[in-house]
Structure formats: structure tokens, C-alpha cells
Amino acid sequence: MYLKKYNLKNKYALVTGAGKGLGRACAIALAEAGCNLVIVSRTKRDIDSVSKIIKKLKVKCKSYICDVTNYNEIKSIINKQSRIDILVNNAGNNIPEHFTKVKTKNMEYLVKVNTIATFNIAQLCAIKMMKLKNRKKVGGSIINMSSQMGHVGGPIRSVYNMNKWGLEGLTKGMAVDLAKYNIRVN
């Protein structure tokens, strides 16, 4: 419904966190615009549900169950693709805890999911995008899903704030580095 006026036919998008929420909505909207999809989620039931909807829209859809913090697993998925034009880097998580009560294991997990995995996926996809012979002509897009928490502080969200502020900086740096390849980063 949302992207029907856009023509993304013959484009290929990778969407992480595609099983629920924003990732699911983005994957379906891209498919409605004619985009072929590679969707990634941690849970089989969620990814199967989204895949079923996308396939009804008569676009190609490959689905993978994957924990994005597993570098080798996500790298393998990305390397299997012949082409990626769009990345919706959406996978993420939050464990609300008061700053003074943040458990180290929770902080490390959130940094791994929200920052390190996001960086790794963006880097792997950017490298794949840059290899396309006519990339400068056809362009590419990387969308790093942030949050208002990347701009303001919030209660019981210190670690999430930290991750999203870092993501904002990463996105700006990537935009500068990838502009000469006509890869837009937002």
C-alpha cells in the first residue's frame, strides 16, 4: 500500500528483523513496490508468515532464520545473494533497565545486536553493492533503523540510547564514505 506508486521492479532488498513490527512492514511495502526480497528473522513462524504474504505479491522472496549477531551466518546469507540494492538494517532489541541496575551481560548483548551486528551487516552489504558494475548509475540505499532515542535520552533506556546515538554517527560516516558509489545511507 505505502510504496505502490514507486517502481522497485528488478531491485533486490535485504531486510533484517523482518519477522515483526517495522521490519515486517518494510518488507511488505517493498514487495508491494515490486522489489524482490531477502528477509531475515530469528523465528521461523514469523518469517514464514511474512514470506507467505510477500510471495502473494508475485515477487521473489528468499527467507532465512538467522541471529544477526552470528557474523558467519549473516555473512553467508549476504554472500549467497547475486545482488543487493537496498538494505533495511532493522534488527534490534531493547532490555529496559535503570542505569544503575544494567546487567553487564544485557549491555553486551544489546551492543552486539544494535551496534556491532548493524555495522557488520551494513559493511557486508555495502561491499556487495559496490561490486555491481553499474552501481553509480543505478544507485543503492542503506537504511539503518534508528529511533528518537538516538536524539534524546529516555528513562530506563541508557544502553539503548547509547546504541542509537552510535548508530546515528555510524550512518553519517557511512553516508560520506559511500556517496561516491551512489549508495545513499539514511
PLM features: residue spans?
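Conserved glycine-rich Rossmann-like NAD(P)H-binding loop of the short-chain dehydrogenase/reductase
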Residues: 35-49
